[in-house]
Amino acid sequence: MGLTKAIIDNINMSSANYIEIFLREQNLQRTSSEEGMDTRSWVNLLLQSGRLNEDTFERFLQEELFYGKRKQIRVYKLEDCRKYVYASDWTKGLERYSDGQSENFSNILGMQPNEEHPRKIVFASMKKNEQAELENIKILFACFIQVSIGRDKFEDSCSYIPVEIDFRRKRMTMKAWQRHNIAWEWYKTDALLDDILDILNKSFQIEVEAFGINHKKVLYAMSRNLINDAYLKIPAFGEVANLKETISNFSNDIIHTLSLIHI
């Protein structure tokens, strides 16, 4: 399938083409015949010709879609983890939503949701302890949406919802980016997050409970970790690497004002 407009829209910003910044970091430059090509066409040509390694590009997409552009965050406390603590507990659900794949895989370029199959898992990464129990699992959901591109005109697109489960801390986080020009209410961020939570419950037996007032200290610590995730784990393209100290100070400044949704 290759690079799609939907993937580009979830990574690039109007002020920065992060995909082409990455390509320059890989020492890839347009040839004279490639001048004027849009990003999508150029990347797919690079992939087809072998000048851009697909696994390398997939890793870039993993990082960007998991940590970049994710402004809305939900934090949950896990209940009975014993129901889904082994990789085998996840096999059936992963295979259902990832076209037959399970455990560790990445197929962001090869899988896109559609109206018939509106939810796909395009990336999964599991970390286990010596007893083969899961310590951490990361899953990236791709959700079919439509955006408005004019009066009564709509375009098929995709929103990515990263989910991370920390079994040691009994914590689950879900992140999302507020897309603009969403065509219908059921494609908006909160509706997508609710739907993914329902899938996790029904297909993976994930159960969560609300954080109460007695969990304020825990939530504060979680908030610090989430801010570090959001601002320190973005791929370090040159200028970002130089901002580490500034970002650290910024995290401290906003810790009391950032609106996190603790359900």
PLM features per residue range, with description:
Residues 1-163, 182-189, 206-251:
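Intrinsically disordered, low-complexity polar/charged tails and linkers
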Residues 165-167:
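Generic beta-strand structural signal
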Residues 169-171:
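Short hydrophobic/glycine-rich mini-motifs in sensory/regulatory modules
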Residues 177:
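Conserved NTP-donor binding/palm subdomain of two-metal-ion nucleotidyltransferases/polymerases, i.e.
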Residues 184-201:
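Acidic (Asp/Glu-rich), glycine- and aromatic
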Residues 249-259:
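Long, contiguous domain-sized segments
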Residues 261-263:
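Conserved small/polar residues in nucleotide/adenosyl-binding loops
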